Structure formats: structure tokens, C-alpha cells
Amino acid sequence: MATFKKFNKDKRPKRNTQSLLFKRKRFCRFTVAGVEEIDYKDIDTLRDFISENGKIIPARLTGTRAIYQRQLNTAIKRARFLAMVPYSDQHRV
């Protein structure tokens, strides 16, 4: 017969309580600014949504609405193809 260990609450890893208390409310920058379409030539805006290693940051982290996230993905991919934005962190522009 198998024996079961009781789960001890004291041995659980403690979460950082400060990070749970001070969560910033995410909002869509494009909705607030009234942007109709995201342009692939606006490199400064696109770089805000690309991580250090060159990946596109997901909408659940940035707070971008779905319609703008799709436009953002397309714009970043176009800018990469035209060598305006690097594909990875190993390519410096």
C-alpha cells in the first residue's frame, strides 16, 4: 500500500509579496494615442515592443489590444525583412 506525504504549508516557496501588491495596470498605448494603423517605418515605437534578444513581446505583457498586436507583429516582421530592425540581439543596427 502506498503511503502519502502530507503537504506542509511552511515549506512552500514564498512569493514576493511586493510584486503582488504593486502590479501596474496595463493599457493599450495605441488606443490612448488614437492610432489607426501601426507603421513599419516607426522604428522607435517598434523597438519598445521587441525584447532584448529580438523577440516580439506578447500582448499579455504589454497590454496591447488584439487588433493592434496583429498590426504590430506585421510591422515588426516587415521592418526586419527590410533590415530596419534586427532579427536577434546578435545583429547590431
Curated annotation (Swiss-Prot):
Listed SUPFAM superfamilies: Ribosomal protein S18 (SSF46911)
GO cellular component: cytosolic small ribosomal subunit
Assembly behavior: Part of the 30S ribosomal subunit. Forms a tight heterodimer with protein bS6.
Domain of life of the source: Bacteria
Gene Ontology molecular function: any one: structural constituent of ribosome
Function text: Binds as a heterodimer with protein bS6 to the central domain of the 16S rRNA, where it helps stabilize the platform of the 30S subunit.
GO annotation, biological process: translation
Gene of this entry: rpsR
Protein species of origin: Variovorax paradoxus (strain S110)
Assigned keywords, A-Z: Ribonucleoprotein, Ribosomal protein, RNA-binding, rRNA-binding
Protein name, UniProt field: Small ribosomal subunit protein bS18
Keyword Nucleotide-binding: no
Similarity field: Belongs to the bacterial ribosomal protein bS18 family.
